[in-house]
Amino acid sequence: MTETISKTMKAVLFDQHGSPEDLHWRDTDTPRPDKDEVLIRVRAAALNGFDPMMLSGETGLKTPFPMTPCGDFAGEIAALGDGVSDWRIGDRVNPYPILPVKGMMGETTPGAAAEYVCVPASVLIKMPDAVSFEDAAAMPVAYGTALRMIATRGDVQAGEKVLVLGAGGGVGVASIQFAKARGAYVIAAASGAHKLDR
């Protein structure tokens, strides 16, 4: 599959911290993949709780403007940078949004509220055909955060007890799934019974 890639694309950009009124849909240069990077055609992007905090400046982090928001997304590889050999154009991918050296997408490096975005090939996860782009786009930040807590930082083992607060949210649901997959006994708490039904 070969795709003609325009030199310009549409993207959501903001030039200063503020409110949703500071987001603008406009033309910008289409990024080109550097060595060991891929260019992804964004098929679906999702907002998470971090995006409004980034837009408002609540995080206190230095943002290089203009910035494109959104770290949660899924798409198809449109171009390969030099040195990328494990991926093919057209592969359906779901990248982890924290990029080595560059930081969090939509915070310190351009996010995915755009037609195209470049990421290192090392952060790609191949999407199963049965998973929609929309479903996959809702997962990276929540599931990445939960995986880091349960597997990397917590090193949860079979038989251990895990308390998940905020169990009805994205990170909570993902934490429950990862902890159960590791054989832990899970105690879940949420602000209401309707959230525990998730």
Predicted segments — roles?
Residues 29-46, 58-99:
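Glycine-rich beta-strand-centered segment in the early N-terminal region that forms part
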Residues 100-109:
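Short, Lys/Arg- and Gly-enriched loop/turn segments at beta-strand edges
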Residues 92, 136-198:
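Mid-domain Rossmann-like dinucleotide-binding core that forms the NAD(H)/NADP(H) cofactor-binding site
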Residues 118-126:
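Structured surface patches comprising rigid loops and adjacent beta-strands/short helices at the edges
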Residues 1-10:
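Basic/polar N-terminal segments that are highly enriched at the extreme N-terminus
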Residues 63, 130-139:
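Short pre-catalytic strand/loop immediately N-terminal to key active-site residues, enriched for Gly-Thr
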